[in-house]
Amino acid sequence: MFGSATRSDATRVLLLGSGELGKEVAIECQRLGLEVIAVDRYDNAPAMQVAHRSHVIDMLDGDALRKLIELEQPHYVVPEIEAIATDTLVSLEAEGVNIVPTANATKLTMNREGIRRLAAEDLQIPTSPFEFADQYDDFVAAVERVGTPCVVKPIMSSSGKGQSVIKTPADIEASWQYAQEGGRAGTGRVVVEGFIKFDYEITLLTTRAVDGIHFCAPIGHRQEEGDYRESWQPQQMSDEALKAAQDVAEKVVNALGGYGLFGVELFVRGNEVLFNEVSPRPHDTGMVTLISQDLSEFALHVRAFLGLPIQQIIQYGPAASAVILGNGISSNIRFDNLTAALSRPQTQVRLFGKPEINGRRRLGVALTRREDTKQAVSDAINAAADVKVIY
């Protein structure tokens, strides 16, 4: 049973993180009449614009987080980002607060070490070689053991922040400094990942729901500077590789537990699949599902954590998304030339409503459906380029 928003028996959903992914989750909650409370570290974040009310707090401050949750008494707490005081969520869950999908899943995946050790050591799933380091000297030794080229990432970051590639020993010091500057929780521990040869990488959106495990068609994507630029669905795979990917994803999400949608990132080499990362929430590359499926990743997430059945996911055919990327300084962002973008057949645009920009920032996404994925990607890129950002 669900209560109506703003009434005494309202079913309340509290979003921890209010970016573009949280905004779409909020919209899906609104469609079911739920009361939405959006939280972020800055005011007027995208999800706040479609929520019933909002709060600005430092979500890494456990006391502030506990105080807010005790104030709002939500039926569901839905993390949208990694930078949250997860130990507080674990304590609150033990006291009866419903954390989506679970507090442990949020804690394990908030940093790359927890989830990498779960996959490689506990579940014995193949991954790229990796080492962790806290201090610079240990970092240098880790790079030597893993070998170059290698990828360096803060254990907690997103959208490519703090990530770099070490090609030669001359890159080591700069890579360390960049990782220290880019972590979500400040300076500290990093992971060094060895390069592996792979044919392509995918996101396998996997929903753990009351009626079982459900897979979306695999999503291919291209990244630049550690952040996604385009994604497409379906990514063509052999039956053997797809089955292997689904087996890995099912093991991971079952180990994490709870109900919700998970974005499982995998490398594919022939029919072999290697685990990369997982997010216990909608994934940025999954924005293509806003046009490619009858139930978007956001609708799937909400339906799952509410304990509702998924039944069947219908994929409409080749589709793609392309990021509308801003690069400037402004607190009054405007957009022009939407007419050109939306004059393209089977094309949609989402503008996220971010209140300001200081450098490079994802401001929207263009979505297309076509007869094949190559054409869909090309047209999505062109539609995104049509949109002019005015700073």
UniProtKB/Swiss-Prot annotation:
Q: What Gene3D superfamilies does this protein map onto?
A: 3.40.50.20, ATP-grasp fold, A domain, ATP-grasp fold, B domain
Per its UniProt record, what InterPro entries does this chain match? ATP-grasp (IPR011761), ATP-grasp_carboxylate-amine (IPR003135), ATP_grasp_subdomain_1 (IPR013815), PreATP-grasp_dom_sf (IPR016185), PurT (IPR005862), PurT/PurK_preATP-grasp (IPR054350), PurT_C (IPR048740), Rudment_hybrid_motif (IPR011054)
Catalysed reactions listed for this entry? N(1)-(5-phospho-beta-D-ribosyl)glycinamide + formate + ATP = N(2)-formyl-N(1)-(5-phospho-beta-D-ribosyl)glycinamide + ADP + phosphate + H(+)
GO molecular function list: ATP binding; magnesium ion binding; phosphoribosylglycinamide formyltransferase 2 activity; phosphoribosylglycinamide formyltransferase activity
Please name one Pfam family that this protein belongs to. PurT_C
ATP-grasp domain: from which residue to which, for each copy?
A: 117-306
Leading EC class = ligase
E.C. code: 6.3.1.21
Q: Name one GO cellular component term.
A: cytosol
Q: Where does ATP bind?
A: R112, K153, S158, S159, G160, K161, G162, Q163, E193, G194, F195, I196, E201
For the ligand (Mg(2+)), the binding residues are: E265, E277
Query: Which pathway?
Result: Purine metabolism; IMP biosynthesis via de novo pathway; N(2)-formyl-N(1)-(5-phospho-D-ribosyl)glycinamide from N(1)-(5-phospho-D-ribosyl)glycinamide (formate route): step 1/1
Lineage top rank: taxon: Bacteria
Annotated residues for binding of N(1)-(5-phospho-beta-D-ribosyl)glycinamide:
E20, L21, E80, D284, K354, R361, R362
Identify the SUPFAM superfamilies for this entry: Glutathione synthetase ATP-binding domain-like (SSF56059), PreATP-grasp domain (SSF52440), Rudiment single hybrid motif (SSF51246)
Q: Which UniProt keywords apply?
A: ATP-binding, Ligase, Magnesium, Metal-binding, Nucleotide-binding, Purine biosynthesis
Q: Tell me the GO BP annotations in alphabetical order.
A: 'de novo' IMP biosynthetic process
Which family is this protein grouped under?
Answer: Belongs to the PurK/PurT family.
UniProt-listed HAMAP family = PurT
Q: What does this protein do?
A: Involved in the de novo purine biosynthesis. Catalyzes the transfer of formate to 5-phospho-ribosyl-glycinamide (GAR), producing 5-phospho-ribosyl-N-formylglycinamide (FGAR). Formate is provided by PurU via hydrolysis of 10-formyl-tetrahydrofolate.
> Could you describe the subunit structure of this protein?
Homodimer.
**The protein's name in its UniProt record:** Formate-dependent phosphoribosylglycinamide formyltransferase
